């Protein structure tokens, strides 16, 4: 198992109004360190052990295998090759992210990669996206070539890219044909398309407002462990309020399906003396 913190992810399927069919999964950061006691000393160790962990989790009945995505750090960063490998080695367990920082993404290329990973897995991808968590890089996304528009906040940038990604996943025309090559003028959608993927996109939310925004866009909700609107009440109550507002906003939109909601809790497995140290 990759070193470092893991989290359990629990969510309801939302398959029927008023019914909470709960599922449980794991969320791995995939840390690796070449230090005494480490069982994941390299990136290869972390990646391969994450695949093995997902296989083992499926065997014992765990419902989901999720990974964190952080850049410029010794942990998992590029999720789609990993998710595709997990999808090819498993048959039932859901696979996904919590979350992909959209500031670092080309939303159209990401739509291609997401569809490919979903098709490889047989439609098991549960993709969490968001603004991302605090990071060690200063303007890291700009190092990738993604510079926000003048006056655009990091959060607005992530939401704008998410909307482009959603349109592409839903099959919208995002380019035009070249009449000189095709003899026609028309729209082009990203290929491949994976039916049903659009209903399996989640937004990682740390505030009430972004949870309501997610509902307005038809996104499932990944409630963050870093809720930023501290009102003096215990965390579980604050999180419950966020989820209630999300469900209310979802109902007001009149979406045909029921949404899914997930929460996560940190777990430190202690099985040996070395773990205690």
Labelled PLM ranges:
Residues 32-48, 100-108, 195-205, 268:
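Active-site mouth loops of central-metabolism enzymes
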Residues 24-28, 65-67, 94-98, 125-129, ...:
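Hydrophobic faces of well-ordered beta-strands that scaffold small-molecule active sites
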Residues 2-20, 150-190, 223, 232-277:
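An alpha-helical appendage that flanks or caps ligand/catalytic pockets
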Residues 18-19, 58-59, 83-92, 114, ...:
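Acidic (Asp/Glu)-rich catalytic clusters
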Residues 71-78, 102-108, 229-234, 269-271:
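Acidic-and-aromatic substrate-binding clefts and catalytic sites of carbohydrate-active enzymes
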Residues 10, 19-43, 104-174, 229:
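Flexible, glycine-rich active-site loops centered on histidine and acidic residues
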Residues 2-93:
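N-terminal beta1-alpha1-beta2 module of alpha/beta enzyme domains
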Residues 209-237:
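A conserved active-site cap/scaffold subdomain adjacent to cofactor or substrate pockets
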């Amino acid at each position: 198992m990759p070193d470092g913190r893991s989290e359990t992810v629990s969510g309801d399927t939302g398959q029927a109004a008023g019914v909470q069919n709960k599922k449980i999964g794991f969320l791995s950061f995939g840390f690796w360190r070449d230090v005494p006691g480490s069982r994941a000393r390299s990136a290869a160790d972390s990646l391969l052990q994450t695949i093995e962990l997902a296989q083992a989790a499926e065997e014992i009945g765990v419902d989901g295998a999720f990974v964190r995505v952080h850049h410029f750090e010794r942990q998992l960063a590029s999720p789609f090759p990993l998710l595709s490998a997990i999808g090819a080695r498993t048959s039932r367990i859901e696979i996904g992210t919590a979350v992909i920082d959209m500031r670092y993404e080309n939303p159209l290329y990401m739509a291609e990669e997401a569809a490919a990973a979903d098709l490889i897995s047989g439609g098991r991808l549960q993709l969490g996206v968001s603004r991302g968590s605090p990071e060690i890089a200063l303007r890291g996304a700009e190092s990738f070539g993604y510079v926000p528009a003048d006056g655009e906040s990091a959060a607005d940038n992530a939401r704008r890219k998410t909307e482009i990604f959603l349109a592409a996943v839903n099959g919208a025309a995002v380019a035009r044909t070249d009449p000189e090559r095709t003899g026609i003028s028309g729209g082009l959608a990203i290929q491949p398309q994976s039916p049903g993927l659009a209903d399996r996109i989640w937004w990682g939310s740390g505030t009430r407002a972004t949870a309501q925004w997610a509902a307005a866009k038809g996104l499932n909700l990944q409630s963050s462990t870093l809720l930023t609107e501290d009102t003096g009440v215990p965390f579980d109550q604050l999180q419950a309020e966020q989820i209630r507002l999300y469900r209310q906003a979802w109902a007001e939109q009149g979406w045909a399906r029921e949404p899914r909601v997930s929460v996560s809790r940190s777990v430190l497995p202690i099985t040996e003396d070395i773990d205690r140290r």
